[in-house]
């Protein structure tokens, strides 16, 4: 298929710039096989039933945006595996070493070996790659990289959120209420609509919940640049499924209960690990690229926000719910003035049979 097959006209005013006042008061579009139902998100309880299994991504967004000086900013992309360690400096003090990939703006102002100081901590540019990507080394005085980012970093809101300045409330609202494993540089946004109250009400109804981890990388915002979509190379992201979670999911599959992925990140994690209809536990990296024709093994329903034209995520939902159906659904959502992207509204999709 061609990239242009996944294009549609999106009015810019539908790109949500701020979260709605209450998480669960965003709109929810139910896209069953028979009809569309537009409701409020808190009514999702009415569309799930006893025995359903909701699978959330529990990754937590880190403050991944750093200002190296007044003219250069970087957005962390991914922690580089097997490279972090603790050592001692010349004075015998404990020093934390950590390596990450990042995207710099403007990258042309940086060269390998440049050093930037944050009090008694240091960032070193170790490598320059293409498309503004760099590799960096953290040398931190007796704190972890996440403690450093909490102190010096900013919440990495997407570029399409165009505000004069960040808001303190973003630290809370660009984070799911259940996130507890640090590592994402962008939010798994389908989960932003959930409150603890809704989760508790779902559990009381007999809906089961489970958690996987996928640390969202900055590559999630990278555009597809090849007209032949099969030539597109996906970024890799770290995933983890515990043995306990795998057992819960496989039991639900065996009992033919519905498995609902909360977000494309949960879906990509589950389908990446699926072999012969079962989920396998473990830590792994995925670069799965889901396009129409993909054979889904695990997920029956998908809760997700509305995605960019010509994006890999719009291709994913077309693969899941049907190419023609998704174009029709998005046309309806635009006519209904639904809000798009990270702080926008949600839709509940059923897998195409």
UniProtKB/Swiss-Prot annotation:
The keyword S-adenosyl-L-methionine applies. HAMAP family: QueA (MF_00113). Pathway: tRNA modification; tRNA-queuosine biosynthesis. This is S-adenosylmethionine:tRNA ribosyltransferase-isomerase. It comes from Rickettsia bellii (strain RML369-C). GO terms for biological process: queuosine biosynthetic process; tRNA wobble guanine modification. It catalyses: 7-aminomethyl-7-carbaguanosine(34) in tRNA + S-adenosyl-L-methionine = epoxyqueuosine(34) in tRNA + adenine + L-methionine + 2 H(+). Monomer. GO terms for molecular function: S-adenosylmethionine:tRNA ribosyltransferase-isomerase activity. It holds the Pfam family Queuosine_synth. The lineage of its organism: Bacteria, Pseudomonadati, Pseudomonadota, Alphaproteobacteria, Rickettsiales. NCBIfam families: PRK00147.1 (NF001140), queA (TIGR00113). Keywords: Cytoplasm, Queuosine biosynthesis, S-adenosyl-L-methionine, Transferase. The keyword Transferase applies. Transfers and isomerizes the ribose moiety from AdoMet to the 7-aminomethyl group of 7-deazaguanine (preQ1-tRNA) to give epoxyqueuosine (oQ-tRNA). Signal peptide: none annotated. It is found in: Cytoplasm. Its main location: cytoplasm. Belongs to the QueA family. InterPro entries: QueA (IPR003699), QueA_dom1 (IPR042118), QueA_dom2 (IPR042119), QueA_sf (IPR036100). PANTHER family: S-ADENOSYLMETHIONINE:TRNA RIBOSYLTRANSFERASE-ISOMERASE. GO terms for cellular component: cytoplasm.
